């Protein structure tokens, strides 16, 4: 369903002269149209009856029933609501004329100018005049008051229809005739004001008769608008009667205007009731909020006035936390409620005053002043409660601080003393070495110093416990028990400390003798152990050599190492004798310590194991060195074999490159001789491929043997490959260049002497001897040959010889340019002149002449592509050889 735009209010302005200007000059000839006359008869009759039925009468024939003027006067009284002069009751003609004149005079008194309408014509039953008079009445009493945005009556009615139907699809009201033929406009007007009467979404634009009948039936049944039109007449008439349509549509305007007035009145009542309901809601909300707030204050004040102290800090902290929770969570919403209550009260009083209602008087005890007083009492109780809480917390805090100080000092002492008795009772020194005993003795001295330092803390703990007892601390029993345990433990620690010192000093003297022997062992065992580890590393070292000289050097070093082994064995036996002496002393005095040496991590078992390992590795090293020596001899043979071939192939490739280069720039002899020589070079190069393949095989063997250098040659396989590929590319390119030169020479008609001269000039200015001239070299070459070049001309020439912008000029480009400059080339003009000879000097040529003078295939080619000649003297079948020739050289669009 289409959405309707919000209603718009319009200002109605009426100008009597303007609205009648168009209608006073209505075209009487139009009423002669039978279709229009039929439509107006039906519409005007229905309109008149819609008003006359209010007086209990109606008309059947519009031109007959108004002839005596009685029903005409009655119609005017009904539609105007005013009384007309008393009619004449006679049946004579002059009575009828008098009654009609009274009606016409009344119409004229309303500012309506009646043009060419006389009472005699109405009395005589003149259809045109009667319809014109009724139309004038309709304009004055049904349409005149319709004015939208200072428009005339007709334009105002049209604008009203346009605005009401604007939101609807397929509706475009532009006039009062053709715009209404599909019936959608009438349906849209009904749906806009009474959407319950019609389902607009189900209407079909292709069913105009059905749409019109539906609209008129609904209007007659629900809107009290009689059926004034025939749907078939409207649809089948090319241009329906405008006045009939306007009359019918104006009935919708008046019907819906009354509905809008009723809606406005209902809205005004709803607005007043809504204001009253909102005021009542605010009153109820104020009463509810005031009751809840006062009840909360009543419950809270006794809680704040409770001053019962607690014995512990935790209990007082709980009260303080409850108070803070009250301040953070419970009170802020109530503050907001109190503020909102005052705002609602003031807002309500303002609304009541604006709407002329009596002021609001809350229930007893719920005035704003009552709430403010209760709130003030709450604030006072809250302030005293907070001060009492803080004072109590400060008092308990002082007592708790002293108890916490006792606990901290007691905990610190207990933590320090934990495990100390067990440590002092240990016999760890009985199995310790001299170093460990000395360390234990120093550690014990440090403990004695620490013990003396803790004497003050123990005294402080006892003093604090005494003070807590005097202040009647609630947990004094536990404090006293803890203090007594600390003092008893302190006495035991002093006794155990003295006993441990004496035991440590005795053990120190017993172990000093053994320590000297351990030290001597460590001084000699460490160097010998390092020597054996180094020897094992050297004997197991992975060696990588690339020559016979390198492996021979390793063999010599190994022989020198084997010569030092007898001396090393003597040192080993001396170290073992020292260790045996240590074990003898330990057994003699029954000392329960480990036989391990504190000065060395080396043991005799390690020395024995490593010495055996050294003796096993020596022959293994001998075998590895001999195997590597044999491998290096084999690699040397591969190097010499590869070098012999590479030293022959490398110079051969270089020599061939030089020969090809000399051949490509020579300026003597014919190009064919040069070509034959290059072909011979190519044949020799291809036959030489077997040598390259053999060298590749030797290179493969060298790579498999992991030989990375070769002092016998400067050539690598990569050098040979690059040189060989360059040689193949160079010979192929050079042969192609000579072939191109031969083709150019033959095509351009250049002599061998000219070609040699071009080559000599190019070679002279090819300073880099790479077969290329740069821009400056090319400019110098052209100047030497007599060219007077400006910048623009030289730039043009460069685009010819260097179209890709490479910055260089090849010999072939140079030859192409020189041949264009010197050779006798074909042009479009030359070809046109040749065709003119074949055509016997005619501006056109015939197909028979082409077949007679040219080979068949070329003649057919020309006939197929030559355009028809249409110039002066043209004959049937004439062909335009001039346009064809220009097209061959790109000088036309053919």
Swiss-Prot record:
UniProt cross-references to Pfam families, sorted A to Z: CH (PF00307), EF-hand_7 (PF13499), EFhand_Ca_insen (PF08726), Spectrin (PF00435)
Record: residues binding Ca(2+) 2: 802, 804, 808
Entry's disease: Cardiomyopathy, familial hypertrophic, 23, with or without left ventricular non-compaction: A hereditary heart disorder characterized by ventricular hypertrophy, which is usually asymmetric and often involves the interventricular septum. The symptoms include dyspnea, syncope, collapse, palpitations, and chest pain. They can be readily provoked by exercise. The disorder has inter- and intrafamilial variability ranging from benign to malignant forms with high risk of cardiac failure and sudden cardiac death.
Intracellular or extracellular location(s): Cytoplasm, Myofibril, Sarcomere, Z line
GO BP, sorted A to Z: actin cytoskeleton organization; actin filament uncapping; cardiac muscle cell development; cell adhesion; focal adhesion assembly; microspike assembly; muscle cell development; negative regulation of potassium ion transport
Organism: Homo sapiens
Calponin-homology (CH) domain location: 38-142, 151-257
Key words of the record: Actin-binding, Calcium, Cardiomyopathy, Cytoplasm, Disease variant, Metal-binding, Phosphoprotein, Repeat, Ubl conjugation
Gene behind the chain: ACTN2
Name the UniProt record assigns to this protein: Alpha-actinin-2
Keyword Repeat on entry: yes
Quaternary organization: Homodimer; antiparallel. Also forms heterodimers with ACTN3. Interacts with ADAM12, MYOZ1, MYOZ2 and MYOZ3. Interacts via its C-terminal region with the LDB3 PDZ domain. Interacts with XIRP2. Interacts with DST isoform 1 (via N-terminus). Interacts with PARVB. Interacts with SYNPO2.
Expression sites (tissue/organ): Expressed in both skeletal and cardiac muscle.
